[in-house]
């Protein structure tokens, strides 16, 4: 069995942070074994690849420009997905746009239905208030009529002050 190192040990050998090693492994797709705790295990070949990456980065290259030539079998190439035909893409886009337009139309119709329902409900409330107002006006008119009748029949009870009768003679008394 070959010698295996954990991420921390490899990072110490390279003089970098352990998260840097993990980032390189992920970015470049380096295939490593993992132990039962999920820790990455590196072999001598992995270490040479990581040193090559480190040297290229130290020389000023960006990570996307780094080329790994040695031990390429350790690098997992990203799978390229097949291209979709332009016609198929446009057809699918058109279907999506039609579906979106249909959903917008349904949403608009639903909103119109809700507004119509609310208007009908408000109209019913206004009609009910109008009927209540009319009945109150009738009751007020009846109460006013009764009050006028009582004032005619019983002027003193209604609060009228009786008129004083002055005799003609009293006017000249000193």
Swiss-Prot record:
| UniProt KW DNA-binding keyword | yes
Coiled-coil ranges from the UniProt annotation: 84-157
**Pfam families, sorted:** MerR_1
Q: What one GO molecular function would you report for this record?
A: double-stranded DNA binding
Cellular localization per UniProt: Cytoplasm
InterPro entries in the cross-refs: Chrosome_anchoring_RacA, DNA-bd_dom_put_sf, MerR-type_HTH_dom
Q: What keyword terms does UniProt attach to this protein?
A: Cell cycle, Cell division, Chromosome partition, Coiled coil, Cytoplasm, DNA-binding, Sporulation
BP-aspect Gene Ontology terms? asymmetric cell division; chromosome condensation; chromosome segregation; regulation of DNA-templated transcription; sporulation resulting in formation of a cellular spore
Q: Name one GO cellular component term.
A: cytoplasm
Residues annotated as DNA-binding are 7-27
What role does it play?
A: Required for the formation of axial filaments and for anchoring the origin regions at the cell poles in sporulating cells, thus ensuring proper chromosome segregation in the prespore. Binds in a dispersed manner throughout the chromosome but preferentially to sites clustered in the origin portion of the chromosome, causing condensation of the chromosome and its remodeling into an elongated, anchored structure.
Mind telling me which HAMAP family this protein's record contains? RacA
Family, per entry: Belongs to the RacA family.
State the name under which the record lists this protein: Chromosome-anchoring protein RacA
Q: Which organism is it from?
A: Halalkalibacterium halodurans (strain ATCC BAA-125 / DSM 18197 / FERM 7344 / JCM 9153 / C-125) (Bacillus halodurans)
């Amino acid at each position: 069995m070959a010698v295996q190192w954990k991420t921390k040990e490899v990072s110490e050998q390279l003089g970098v942070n352990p998260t840097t090693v993990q980032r390189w492994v992920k970015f470049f797709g380096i295939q490593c074994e993992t132990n039962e705790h999920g820790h990455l295990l590196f072999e001598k070949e992995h270490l040479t690849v990581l040193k090559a990456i480190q040297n290229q980065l130290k020389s000023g290259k960006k990570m996307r420009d780094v080329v790994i030539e040695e031990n390429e079998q350790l690098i997992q190439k990203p799978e390229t997905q097949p291209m979709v035909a332009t016609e198929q893409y446009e057809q699918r886009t058109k279907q999506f746009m039609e579906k979106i337009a249909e959903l917008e139309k349904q949403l608009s119709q639903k909103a119109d239905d809700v507004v119509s329902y609310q208007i009908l409900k408000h109209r019913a409330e206004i009609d009910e208030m109008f009927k209540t107002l009319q009945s109150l006006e009738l009751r007020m008119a009846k109460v006013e009529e009764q009050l006028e009748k009582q004032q005619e029949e019983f002027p003193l009870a209604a609060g009228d002050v009786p008129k004083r009768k002055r005799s003609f003679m009293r006017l000249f008394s000193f």
